[in-house]
Amino acid sequence: MTRVDMTETGNGGAREQRRTGSRVRSVLDRWRHDPGVWRRGTLLAASAVLLALLMVFHAQIPNKIGNLGSLTETFLPWLGVFIPVILVAAVLRRSATALIAALLPGVIWLNFFGGLVTDKSGAGGDLMVVSHNVNADNPDPEGTARRIAGSGADVVALEELKPGMVPVYERALADTYPYHSVQGTVGLWSKHPMSDSRPVDIRLGWTRAMRATVTVPQGEVAVYVAHLPSVRVKLNAGFTANQRDDSADALGEAIVREELGKVILLGDLNGTMNDRSLNAVTSQMRSTQGAAGDGMGFSWPAAFPMTRIDQILVKGVEPVASWTLPATESDHLPIAARVTL
């Protein structure tokens, strides 16, 4: 009796496979003998080509009109969302032209961002660093500090520190991090000795960047913390980022002048690695997320991360792993990395 059931089940599975194969062949036959399969969907095909051109030539989009180029580069990975839409529409339209055209932006997207989707992180590392924009209006600064301390980081950079809340962070982090320095609205906490802590002028008129020397068993490391000005999207002005861009240039100049060979930059740069306006910084440093990250590493907004505007960049240091930490009460996710010195 059991043999009969197994045979019937096997035969049923085989029949189902034959039916599926027959349906696929039927669809292919209809497409093959449809004289309009190459004529339909020209608008979809044109959309796919335009999408591909937008990704390839994004650097040519001018910033003179509302910083449109930087806005496009900030959300560049999300252009890939349109690829499956075009593919589905091409199938529904029964357009071979549109299907083939949709492969073009798909290949380009994979070339640009396919490597970021995979986990490139490794084991080990000499130093774990964390950066977090804690949000000036954070309703639970003490809880945020405890979570950051619980991450196991050796060095912690905090941005958007409200002056009245600095003592709260200092008390909550004191047991884990005996060395720290706060300059303006940014601060650095370390398990290792710190020296030469000072503000960095990024042309704002107040302090939102600093540097310090952290001495670890492998030697001295220059650690920079920066919070570049926010950008705004306005209906009458587009993507306003002039102040951010000027500050990025100043920060890049400060890093060029740095005398130590090992440099780590932690902070909220209010821009992605694709944003040309941050070239003064990104052209001389490596992103830990790009080199050794787990996924895209989107950090903002915390409720539904869509882009990575918080960065850990290094020079003379080898990234081992990079990732985002669980959310706190901030509107940004904390980001972390392990590096070899």
How would you label these PLM feature ranges?
Residues V88-A96:
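Structural signal for the C-terminal ends of transmembrane alpha-helices
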Residues R32-P35, V49-A52, W109, N135, ...:
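Short acidic/polar alpha-helix capping motifs at helix-coil junctions
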Residues M128-V130, A157, L265:
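Residue-level marker for buried hydrophobic side chains located in beta-strands
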Residues N135-A149, E160-L341:
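Soluble catalytic domains of enzymes that build or remodel membrane lipids, polysaccharides, and related
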Residues I100-R146, G150, S197:
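N-terminal signal-anchor transmembrane helix
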